[in-house]
Structures are given as structure tokens and as C-alpha cells.
């Protein structure tokens, strides 16, 4: 790729990151103010506030990491890579909890276990969020340990031992990444499948009853599915692209690096837009802040 093409993708990446920082900063600020003012938030808004804050940090660290790598500041980049690992892991889990929360609250399954989860989920959200931070911390510690060992091995004069240890480190890092990303991803998929099945059952039941003018249950299903269906695409692409990068299936550290970064982070950037447009509080705050702004309905 020529320098001009690389420069274009650098500009696109910076603009995309700036938009994501503004979007997530806006969500975190609006919900954070309400959290402080009312001494609490509904469980769904609490997850969304934490998700917005984690994505704000994730995009900021991604920008720093990419420019530090371009400037060859590898030592400083290694420290920020540990922070990126923490925020990325936390972001995966916060996203999964939001999907599970939607599924539990909106779905209409009658199994006793499901009723028990529905009854407990709101009160369990603070502990789930704290657990996500703990998992992110453990992930960061594991990443820091691996980086330290890799740096020590780089100074080893025995090349046979060096190559064996580096091969082990790469295998360890890939397994670590897969464990931290794949588990929440499959929980997210399960939540969407259950929610879609619940909507299908609800629509089938409606065929045998007289249609109501305002079917709020169906509307709730459709609104959640619109948000989750779009994000299923974005979240899957983000997970797959990260997996490909870690597995080194494609060499993305060359001239195509910036194009790869644009595509990778595009998914979660677009999902932040969907979250703002599908949330009543966010739409209201946008309307107050920008009265002349035409906001499309979700």
C-alpha cells in the first residue's frame, strides 16, 4: 500500500476514534451525572454506563498504542498494551452482561430457573460488573507476566532456547486471548438466540389471539432485536478480526495495518451509535443538547 493510501486510513482511523470517544464520553457523562444525582441507576443503565466508560478507554488506548508502535516506542507501548488487554477484556464482559440483561428482562420463558434469574439479575448487576473488573485485572496480570518473560527471553544469548520460549509464549498468549474473548462471545450468542426464540414464540401465540392495538411485548422484542441483531454482526466481526490478528493468520503489521485497525474498531463504534439512538434517555439528552438535531427513531 502506498504512503498516500496509508495516510488516508490513518485519517479515517483518527476520525472514527474521535467519533467513538465523543459518543461513549457522552453516554458515560449523561448516565454518570444521573448516577451521582439520584444515588443510583437502573440495572440496564448501570451496565450501559460502565460499557461506555470502558469503550472510551479502549478507543483512547488503541489510538495511543498504534501511534506508539508507529514511532517505535516499544517499551512504552508494552505498558499500554497491558492496559488495552484489561479494557478489552472488561469491554467484552460488559457487552455480554448487557445482552444477557436484555434477554432475561424481555424474554417470556416460563421455566422456574429463568424466573429465578429474572428475579435476581437486577440485584446481581453490581457484582457482575465487579466480577468483570476482576477478570480484566487477572487478564492484565497474565499479559504483564507474559510480556516480562518475553522481554527477558529477548536478552537470552542461546537462540535455541530463545525460539522455543518465544514459540511457547505465542501459544500461551493465543490461548489466553481465546479464553478471555471466546467465553463471553458465546454467552452473547446464546442470549441472542434465546431472545429470538422468545420473539418467535410470542408471535406464534399472537396468531391465535385477537391482535391488540398496542402490543408492547412485541415492540420490546423488536427494539431489542434490532439493537442486538446489528451488534451481532459488529461484535462477531470485532471478535473474528482480533482472533485473526492474535493467531497471525494474516500479516496485518505491514502496510495494511491502519486499514485493518479501521475495520476492527468500526463495529463497536457503530454499536455505540445504535445504543444512543435506541435509548430514551440518550435521545432526550441529545435533543436537549442539540435542539435542532434531527434524531432518527430506532
From Swiss-Prot:
Residues 28-55, 118-128, 198-229, 279-298 are cytoplasmic. One of its GO terms (cellular component) is membrane. The keyword Heme does not apply. Glycans are attached at residue 158. Coiled coil: none annotated. One of its GO terms (biological process) is detection of chemical stimulus involved in sensory perception of bitter taste. Putative taste receptor which may play a role in the perception of bitterness. This is Taste receptor type 2 member 134. It comes from Mus musculus.
